[in-house]
Swiss-Prot record:
The lineage of its organism: Eukaryota, Metazoa, Chordata, Craniata, Vertebrata. Residues 1-32 form the signal peptide. Transmembrane segments: none annotated. Keywords: Cytokine, Disulfide bond, Glycoprotein, Secreted, Signal. The keyword Glycoprotein applies. Disulfide bonds join C110-C168, C115-C170. This is Interleukin-25.
Length: 177
């Protein structure tokens, strides 16, 4: 028979849930501008070069953490950023493409295959799996514009959706059968 969570544990879960929701609302609410012209002036003009350097996605701080090679050593920190305190801790990896706007996107990578126990903060609980949470981010890819007689006149911005992993979440395992 399972014990009911104590008031302190329950409020910790609610607090963690609210922090994750706030983080996701912040990141998902920062879409790129969709009203840019489809073809920009030539590369020599300042405005196009400024656009290529401008990123509309908030840049999370890079963590020095590396993926845990030993799953039994997965831990949830007591302080620090949300990604290290979560019961499904993650780190960020840079994805840079110089022909994409924004050029820099950060992808979450789960540090543990299972969730960290809320009771100990250090041992993994096999009743929960750490899985990535994704968002489709609007990005623009730079493509050459064709001028008169096949000459290149600047470049065009091609709008696409790009799948970005935002965070890791603790989920119940799927039951096949």
């Amino acid at each position: 028979m399972r014990e009911r969570p104590r008031l302190g544990e329950d409020s910790s879960l609610i607090s963690l849930f609210l922090q994750v929701v706030a983080f996701l609302a912040m990141v998902m609410g920062t879409h790129t501008y969709s009203h840019w012209p489809s073809c920009c002036p030539s590369k020599g003009q300042d405005t196009s070069e400024e656009l290529l350097r401008w990123s509309t996605v908030p840049v999370p701080p890079l963590e020095p953490a590396r993926p845990n090679r030993h799953p039994e050593s997965c831990r949830a920190s007591e302080d620090g950023p949300l990604n290290s305190r979560a019961i499904s801790p993650w780190r960020y990896e840079l994805d840079r493409d110089l022909n994409r706007l924004p050029q820099d996107l950060y992808h979450a990578r789960c540090l543990c295959p299972h969730c960290v126990s809320l009771q100990t903060g250090s041992h993994m609980d096999p009743r929960g799996n750490s899985e990535l949470l994704y968002h489709n981010q609007t990005v623009f890819y730079r493509r050459p514009c064709h001028g008169e007689k096949g000459t290149h006149k600047g470049y065009c911005l091609e709008r696409r959706l790009y799948r970005v992993s935002l965070a890791c979440v603790c989920v119940r395992p799927r039951v096949m059968g």
